[in-house]
Amino acid sequence: MAEASERLYRVEYAKSGRASCKKCSESIPKDSLRMAIMVQSPMFDGKVPHWYHFSCFWKVGHSIRQPDVEVDGFSELRWDDQQKVKKTAEAGGVAGKGQDGSGGKSEKTLGDFAAEYAKSNRSTCKGCMEKIEKGQVRLSKKMLDPEKPQLGMIDRWYHPTCFVKNREELGFRPEYSASQLKGFSLLSAEDKEVLKKQLPGVKSEGKRKGDEVDGADEVAKKKSKKGKDKDSKLEKALKAQNDLIWNIKDELKKACSTSDLKELLIFNQQQVPSGESAILDRVADGMAFGALLPCKECSGQLVFKSDAYYCTGDVTAWTKCMVKTQTPSRKEWVTPKEFREISYLKKLKVKKQDRIFPPETSAPAPPHLPPSVTSAPTAVNSSCPADKPLSNMKILTLGKLSQSKDEAKATIEKLGGKLTGSANNASLCISTKKEVEKMGKKMEEVQAANVRVVCEDFLQDVAASTKSLQELLSAHSLSSWGAEVKVEPVEVAAPKGKSAAPSKKSKGLYKEEGVNKSEKRMKLTLKGGAAVDPDSGLEHSAHVLEKGGKVFSATLGLVDIVKGTNSYYKLQLLEDDKESRYWIFRSWGRVGTVIGSNKLEQMPSKEDAVEHFMKLYEEKTGNAWHSKNFTKYPKKFYPLEIDYGQDEEAVKKLTVKPGTKSKLPKAVQELVGMIFDVESMKKALVEYEIDLQKMPLGKLSKRQIQAAYSILSEVQQAVSQGSSDSQILDLSNRFYTLIPHDFGMKKPPLLNNADSVQAKVEMLDNLLDIEVAYSLLRGGSDDSSKDPIDVNYEKLKTDIKVVDRDSEEAEVIRKYVKNTHATTHNAYDLEVMDIFKIEREGESQRYKPFKQLHNRRLLWHGSRTTNFAGILSQGLRIAPPEAPVTGYMFGKGIYFADMVSKSANYCHTSQGDPIGLILLGEVALGNMYELKHASHISKLPKGKHSVKGLGKTTPDPSASITLEGVEVPLGTGIPSGVNDTCLLYNEYIVYDIAQVNLKYLLKLKFNFKTSLW
């Protein structure tokens, strides 16, 4: 059963007379029965109710099949009102006579379903995503756009056959028939007959006499009678219980003030909630069933919600308690002596009893969500049908493509997308490299709108590849700019407001027209200690205040997987660049979306501004601004150590196109440019769902990344020990708060298995290397006389020389590449583009003690291009102590291979980005500890210097050559004779960084054999 907070609908008695009905706009009187649909707020990370008069709610059209399961607050209603809601839901809501003139029950017109002839060929079927041709019969279900609820209900059209397929999900009940569709009477007689056959109404009838077999019907009747008697008894008990509770509430309202009720709760050691009705509910529950004892797991307060008692406490500062029970521990409810003067309390005697619950019913499939529709857009179109990967995306085409415009349009529409002629409306641009280089007026508009440009091959690959949309976008990208691709919002079924005109104030969650600046990557204006948020409108006239060495800017995060929230809160104290004027700017919302808002307040003085800033910070975090040791409190935000340092402009200078000043060989220049390519770093982070708006590239501190590693270690331990759900939930909340992720409107996934831990470890490994690369870009010399390439080259602290293609050295390496390409790695061939001889500063000196060790081999090590700035400047490193051992088959060490393709797979190239880098290192292996299966090595056995994971295939040892005492295993792969191993190929692991001396770096081209990889 869904928790109350997750239910789409809510019912209650109006707490005041302030709310207005979304259908008729009239006020809803206090204490009258009202119903709501819960919609995502465009202003903050949470849902809000859209209230209706009870009768108006049904007029706008809803399909509630089980009110006790689907409607929050149903069980708290008076018994008669519960029956009223049930009967109205069963009858399909309020409706008039059927359009064919009959007034029978089965012929009521269904207000939220319609039939008509398509007025144009512009509509798209929401079932198959194909066009509905003009003049064809089409059926609709009214649905709400969750991002723009003020637009009310919108018809979402289907082909009749697609509607029939999705009948149950759309809430078109078995007893409904085609003749109940609005507009049915306007169809031709022929089309009416076809629809009646496609959508017949099924009447519930008993068995015919001819169906009876050997008295089976009599047995069924007896069983049915017993079941009915049992249900009748339970229903009577539930009614009596409901009457008792409401009798207590009615009498308490007459006899006691709200202050009296609070006193009763405090005396019985119950928490006092906010709101008069909640206080009354708690007192009535205690009087009827006894005072609730604290939760056994966290000592929190248990509270009745629809189907059980839920704990409202917190197991830790990060996570709420998950305890839910129908049989909570209680003690006797005690009325204080001074309250016995109240006649009702004096004579009230309730027999001790347990609360009765209706039998649990599984929630029906949400009627408002067709299979191809999600509640809100995400950064990647993961929820669309497999054959419609571009669903809800607008595509712009520019330049001369191999297909004609009509062919391209047909291809895009077949994949679920729409063609657009405006850069401002586009999700994506398809063009050519030539057009990007030419940079014509249209392409300038695309760049200004920050729309990503991809090559035409993207259309072919997106139709066939099993890779995620985001990976394919990264692989086929042609532009150095481009925000994360957003799809158009899709709708969920919900009621219609009175007016269909959009509110001028409300932007909705995702703009369809124009470009929302917060949807694209922000340009941060850096002044002094931090970046001024551009949403403040003061980025060119003010700066962030710095006082006493502290920058008055804070970025806070809060993740609650249970509630599905992924929130941020930003706070800045801004000072005018010229005058003594001060502002407090704050913004809040959901990470990875444009849900949220902001506020700019001008303050009377600097002192007032500082005081207000500190007050807000403490209110949001529970900690004083100047507190040295931060303490996390439940439901409070946590500060992210995001450094919007002063060196952003320096990075831009160093990443501009190199001039002619560099004396480095062309191949080395290209290599350095590749290693320090900021766009590649961004792409890598986008693949990991890192939010580049809340956590710009290179801004998360190393300390925070290490803290995230520690959490993953705890997750690994919790998973392996089978820890409680609460502990897993707590660790997941902590991790996602520390490392902001962009999940769009999806709930953050739990980190509850080894695979998810391994994926996040890999993400943090890359984050650390990218942090190193970005730190190198920002730091060091600011010598404007040097070419940017030379400046970056010096930061690598590595001597890089190009190896002559015709040399014997190059021939040996090319042979090593050719011979050791494994037969199972057959998706690509490797082409050696350049070979570089490398010597890292200080590495040969560090390696010197191991130079005399026997068994030294030249082995492969592959990694992402984005990691090479860190590798060359700091060497190959072992995972930090904080990192979990999961993902490292033989523990934390440096891994090598003797088969080139085994290492090449770690380069993470793709057809759209086929160039990778791979290393050859001299590795001092000495005595090897040979293993056939995973073993988390923390310390090698005595006398061993390394680990060898034995593979089933090995380079032919007879073909190995020795160069300067180092074995080069360049033979072709042959069976090793080791069969009972879990490895296909050998792995070599050393646990001391000094045992590695990097010798060569190869630039490889991965020639993929087919686009269907």
UniProtKB/Swiss-Prot annotation:
UniProt modified residues of type ADP-ribosylserine: 499, 503, 506, 518
Residues bearing PTM N6-(ADP-ribosyl)lysine: 520
Modified sites of kind Phosphoserine: 41, 177, 179, 185, 274, 277, 781, 785
Protein's cellular compartments: Chromosome; Nucleus; Nucleus, Nucleolus; Cytoplasm, Cytosol
Stretches assigned to the PARP alpha-helical domain: 661-778
Residues joined by cross-link Glycyl lysine isopeptide (Lys-Gly) (interchain with G-Cter in SUMO1): 203, 486, 747
Entry keyword Metal-binding: yes
Residues carrying the site annotation Cleavage: 214-215
PTM annotation, UniProt: Poly-ADP-ribosylated on serine, glutamate and aspartate residues by autocatalysis. Auto-ADP-ribosylation on serine takes place following interaction with HPF1. Auto poly-ADP-ribosylation on serine residues promotes its dissociation from chromatin. Poly-ADP-ribosylated by PARP2; poly-ADP-ribosylation mediates the recruitment of CHD1L to DNA damage sites. Mono-ADP-ribosylated at Lys-520 by SIRT6 in response to oxidative stress, promoting recruitment to double-strand breaks (DSBs) sites.
MF-aspect GO terms: damaged DNA binding; NAD binding; NAD+ poly-ADP-ribosyltransferase activity; NAD+-protein mono-ADP-ribosyltransferase activity; NAD+-protein-aspartate ADP-ribosyltransferase activity; NAD+-protein-glutamate ADP-ribosyltransferase activity; NAD+-protein-histidine ADP-ribosyltransferase activity; NAD+-protein-serine ADP-ribosyltransferase activity
Segments of this protein annotated with the region Automodification domain: 373-523
PTM annotation (PolyADP-ribosyl aspartic acid): residues: 387
Swiss-Prot/TrEMBL keywords: Acetylation, ADP-ribosylation, Allosteric enzyme, Apoptosis, Chromosome, Cytoplasm, DNA damage, DNA repair, DNA-binding, Glycosyltransferase, Immunity, Innate immunity, Isopeptide bond, Metal-binding, NAD, Nucleotidyltransferase, Nucleus, Phosphoprotein, Repeat, Transcription, Transcription regulation, Transferase, Ubl conjugation, Zinc, Zinc-finger
Active site: 987 (for poly [adp-ribose] polymerase activity)
Catalytic activity: NAD(+) + (ADP-D-ribosyl)n-acceptor = nicotinamide + (ADP-D-ribosyl)n+1-acceptor + H(+); L-seryl-[protein] + NAD(+) = O-(ADP-D-ribosyl)-L-seryl-[protein] + nicotinamide + H(+); L-aspartyl-[protein] + NAD(+) = 4-O-(ADP-D-ribosyl)-L-aspartyl-[protein] + nicotinamide; L-glutamyl-[protein] + NAD(+) = 5-O-(ADP-D-ribosyl)-L-glutamyl-[protein] + nicotinamide
Chain positions of cross-link Glycyl lysine isopeptide (Lys-Gly) (interchain with G-Cter in SUMO2): 192, 203, 249, 467, 486, 511, 527, 747
Binding site for Zn(2+) 3: 295, 298, 311, 321
Domain of life: Eukaryota
Enzyme Commission (EC) number: 2.4.2.30, 2.4.2.-
Domain BRCT: 385-476
UniProt comment concerning the protein's domains: The two PARP-type zinc-fingers (also named Zn1 and Zn2) specifically recognize DNA strand breaks: PARP-type zinc-finger 1 binds PARP-type zinc-finger 2 from a separate PARP1 molecule to form a dimeric module that specifically recognizes DNA strand breaks. The PADR1-type (also named Zn3) zinc-finger mediates an interdomain contact and is required for the ability of PARP1 to regulate chromatin structure.
Family: Belongs to the ARTD/PARP family.
Name listed for the protein in its UniProt record: Poly [ADP-ribose] polymerase 1
Lineage: Eukaryota, Metazoa, Chordata, Craniata, Vertebrata
Gene that this polypeptide is encoded by: PARP1
